Amino acid sequence: MPSLLLIIFVTELVVQLVNTLGATTINDLLWRIYLTLPTPLSLEFAQQRRKQKEYLAVRHELKATSSQDEFAKWAKLRRQHDKLLEDLEKKKASLEAARTKFDRTLTTTRTVSTRSVQWFLPFWYSKEPMFWLPYGWFPYYVEWFASFPRAPMGSVSIVVWQWACTAVIALMIEAATAALVYVAAKQSQKIRQPVPAQSEKKDS
């Protein structure tokens, strides 16, 4: 079984990443990955794309056909156009329902898997020490706080370890974000910086 230290750290890391990137962004990424897998749903999307190309081709041809000069051809294209449009709308509604179900399942799974760990483990293992502080290194009030709420005195409780993981991960993500913004700004500034014109050489 993985260590409780690692489980708590990974859980808080996942929660912080979701909060930083956004649940919608993560759902979109996982949805695109899911559609690349050989599933019936990905096959439906491929069929929809082919039908959409066919619809656009018929629509283009319909616009280029005169209803007065070529009525028979225009009427045939019109029926084909309406049939394809109806099929596309039905398929779109079906695929949107599948996407909604996917998002709901993903959100529920993510919430249950993270929140259950965040709430259940600290409650269940509240008396278990995560690790022990070096004896005599810290004053009484530090040891009391580290063992809050019910871990043995002189140890670090699972609640305090969870708080520490959350704080450290949040700081790391904030620092990484600031570094990326700084690098991007430097690159943008370098691109915008005008190239100085070379001075003409003086005649000797």
UniProtKB/Swiss-Prot annotation:
Location (main, coarse): endoplasmic reticulum
Parts of the chain that traverse the membrane: 5-24, 111-131, 156-172
Signal sequence, start to end: none
Keyword list, A-Z: Coiled coil, Endoplasmic reticulum, Membrane, Transmembrane, Transmembrane helix, Transport
Cellular component annotations (GO), alphabetically ordered: endoplasmic reticulum membrane; GET complex
Record topological domains on the Cytoplasmic side: 25-110, 173-204
Coiled-coil residues: 72-107
InterPro entries: Get1, Get1_fungi, Helix_hairpin_bin_sf
Annotated compartments: Endoplasmic reticulum membrane
Single Gene Ontology MF annotation: protein-membrane adaptor activity
Membrane topology classification: Multi-pass membrane protein
Top-level taxon of the source organism: Eukaryota
UniProt topological domain (Lumenal) ranges: 1-4, 132-155
Quaternary structure note: Interacts with GET3.
Similarity-based family: Belongs to the WRB/GET1 family.
Biological function: Required for the post-translational delivery of tail-anchored (TA) proteins to the endoplasmic reticulum. Acts as a membrane receptor for soluble GET3, which recognizes and selectively binds the transmembrane domain of TA proteins in the cytosol.
Protein name: Protein GET1
Gene for this chain: GET1
